[in-house]
Amino acid sequence: MRGFYIGRFQPYHNGHHSMVERISEEVDELVLGIGSADDSHTTHDPFTAGERIMMITKAVAEYDLTTYVVPLEDINRNAVWVSHVESMCPDFDVAYSNNPLVVRLFEEAGIEVRQSPMFDRDRLEGSEIRQRMIDDESWRDRVPASVVEVIEEIHGIKRLQHVSDSDSLERYAATGESLPESLDDLDD
């Protein structure tokens, strides 16, 4: 049996890894869909699809599970999203997701969906890990060692910190606020 599991994997973290381990007990093969594959170099989506493929491929190598990592661009049309996924991926028998919209879309398309409890969600959330990277706080214990290696290889922290600064500048420009004259002028 082949399963399907989608995520943005920004970055691939220990919560995703625990989910893949759980799924590996139920299926013979797994398709890992990289959502928002067309987005990168932003605070929300700092890593490219290729970089996420490297993270995932290296991390799941420890499991005795045939995996296919497939980048999936956003199409922003929920009514045809499952058809888009099916056209881009090997056939699969069951989808795994805890996202209510994804669950609904697959169920409406007649595809079995299995959900599982989130793994240490407070610590293992992509936005929290990215913020820790930006703030130069501890994050390495929240991702597999192979993912740390990929992020270091691509200078991912430096990129994320840089795009975070750019995003901040864009927010100031969009709101018409003036930038503070010094860091001392920023509110805590």
From Swiss-Prot:
**One Pfam family in the UniProt entry:** CTP_transf_like
Location(s), subcellular: Cytoplasm
Q: Which InterPro entries match?
A: Cyt_trans-like, NMN_Atrans_arc, Rossmann-like_a/b/a_fold
Please verify whether the record's keywords include Nucleotidyltransferase. yes
* Reactions catalysed: beta-nicotinamide D-ribonucleotide + ATP + H(+) = diphosphate + NAD(+)
Tell me which GO cellular component terms the UniProt record holds.
cytoplasm
What's a BP term from Gene Ontology annotated to this protein?
Answer: NAD biosynthetic process
**Biological pathway:** Cofactor biosynthesis; NAD(+) biosynthesis; NAD(+) from nicotinamide D-ribonucleotide: step 1/1
> In the Enzyme Commission scheme, what number(s) does this protein have?
2.7.7.1
Q: Read off the PANTHER family from this record.
A: BIFUNCTIONAL NMN ADENYLYLTRANSFERASE_NUDIX HYDROLASE, PHOSPHOPANTETHEINE ADENYLYLTRANSFERASE
- Which HAMAP family has this protein been placed in? NMN_adenylyltr (MF_00243)
Q: Which family does it belong to?
A: Belongs to the archaeal NMN adenylyltransferase family.
Q: Know the name of this protein? A: Nicotinamide-nucleotide adenylyltransferase
